A protein has these predicted regions:
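N-terminal small-domain helix-loop-helix segment of the aminotransferase-like
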Residues: 3-98, 105, 276-279, 298, ...
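Helix C-cap/helix->beta junction micro-motif
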Residues: 25-29, 134, 193-194, 342, ...
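Short acidic capping loops at alpha-helix termini that bridge into adjacent secondary structure
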Residues: 87-93, 113-116, 222-223
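Conserved PLP-anchoring active-site segment centered on the Schiff-base-forming lysine
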Residues: 109-131
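Active-site phosphate-binding strand-loop segment of PLP-dependent enzymes
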Residues: 139, 143-212
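Conserved core segment of the aminotransferase class I/II
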Residues: 222-290, 300-302, 382-384
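Conserved glycine-rich beta-strand-loop-beta hairpin in the small C-terminal domain of fold type I
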Residues: 274, 290-300, 311-324
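PLP-dependent enzyme catalytic core of the Aspartate aminotransferase-like
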Residues: 337-346, 352-386
């Protein structure tokens, strides 16, 4: 008799399986170049590291307020005001244990089993898998290159009935595409008119290329939820700190759930992150983005030279999402073979698209430039052999 619950029988996060296989190869061969990791290889900014040492010396290890310390909520509110021009009160801010914690909290606070929540396909698998585990009905919009792999009002109008929730991510994982600001405003308006909770995943804000404006959902509507994180732009993945901007009517439920589930976000991470939003940190972090831009150019040019040319636009984040249908009809097996024969780790598309992901892969360019170049050389040798 299995002791697993039915809700636990969701698909695995395949990227984590790739990481495990890559770590095992690194132990046995020592030659792994990972283009699978969805995390920066750059360090947390210097002011954050200094503040961490100060917090440790001051023994700031105890519980904090459930929604986070007031100083951090003020800093996050100020960050949104500076970045997008809209005012944010510290009471609007809910600090969480990573953006993953924010998503779980808002899913529990806003949706009941059986509720329909709409997501884009391709998209981040944890949306679909977590919602499924919570008993929600997940409807995927088939988003293609024509809409830059982003949902549109026209797609929402074709649904048989308005959903309880809609998740929009811009810049998106895995495609790196950004939703047009006017389209985001239209989507937010549609959600307001139809009683649909808009959840805007904005964790890759700050990492963009080409100068297009990055829009935030709260520029248009305060009835939705904005999700942020220190993981991506701020290079603080393992610190496990995120936040959401939540409307007042959801905060009591969020408070009840968060206080029971996590008590509070990690204290040391909160005191450290206070110093992530200043000018010194931003100068350092923008230099990281410049490095990603260099890596992006090298990777896109290198892939084209290898005959891999069907790519999502990669407006932001640090991913290239490629169609390799001319090379394989099984991206899982192909990625495993590439790792076994070259030491290059890639993310199979099935994580992000359960319909067409058998012919796609995601490549991260967040690593060192030399590693991107070396990985391209190995991939070229592999493709010539096969």
């Amino acid at each position: 008799v299995s002791i697993e619950s039915r809700r636990s029988t969701i698909p695995p996060f395949y990227v984590m399986d790739v990481w495990k296989a890559a770590a095992e190869r690194a132990r046995t061969h020592g030659d792994v170049l990972s283009l699978a990791a969805g995390q920066p290889s750059t360090p947390a900014p210097a002011p954050v590291l200094r503040a961490t040492k100060t917090a440790i010396d001051a023994e700031l290890f105890g519980y904090t307020e459930t929604f986070g310390i007031l100083a951090l909520r003020r800093a996050i509110a100020g960050h949104h005001h500076r970045s997008y021009g809209y005012p944010v009160d510290p009471d609007d801010v809910v600090v969480t244990t990573g953006s993953s914690g924010a998503f779980t909290l808002i899913f529990l606070a806003a949706f009941d089993p059986g509720d329909t929540v709409v997501v884009a396909r391709p998209g981040y698998p944890a949306y679909r898998n977590t919602l499924t585990a919570l008993g929600c009905r997940v409807v995927e919009l088939d988003c293609r290159a024509e809409t830059r792999f982003q949902p549109t009002v026209a797609m929402l109008e074709e649904l048989p009935r308005p959903p309880k929730g809609l998740i929009v991510a811009s810049p998106a994982n895995p495609t790196g595409t950004m939703i047009d600001p006017d389209e985001l405003a239209a989507v937010a308006g549609w959600c307001d008119a139809h009683g649909t909770l808009l959840i805007s995943d904005e964790i890759y804000h700050g990492i963009t290329y080409g100068g297009e404006r990055t829009a935030s959902a709260w520029e248009t509507s305060r009835s939705g939820v904005v999700i942020g994180s220190v993981s991506k732009y701020f290079s603080m993945t393992g610190w496990r700190l995120g936040w959401m901007l939540a409307p007042p009517e959801l905060r009591p439920a969020l408070q009840r759930l968060a206080s029971n589930m996590t008590v509070c976000p990690p204290a040391i991470s909160q005191y450290a992150a206070l110093h992530a939003f200043g000018d010194e940190a931003r100068t350092e972090l923008d230099a990281h983005v410049h490095r990603y831009a260099v890596n992006r150019a090298i990777l896109l040019e290198g892939l084209a030279g290898l005959g891999i040319t069907d790519l999502a636009p990669a407006d932001g984040a640090f991913y290239a999402y490629a169609d390799i249908g001319h090379l394989t009809a099984d991206s899982m097996a192909w990625c495993a073979d590439v790792l076994a024969n070259t030491g290059v780790a890639l993310a199979p598309g099935l994580d992000f698209d359960i319909v067409n992901g058998h012919r796609t892969i995601r490549l991260s360019f967040a690593g060192a430039t030399a590693e991107i170049e070396a990985a391209l050389t190995r991939l070229g040798d592999y493709l010539r052999r096969t």
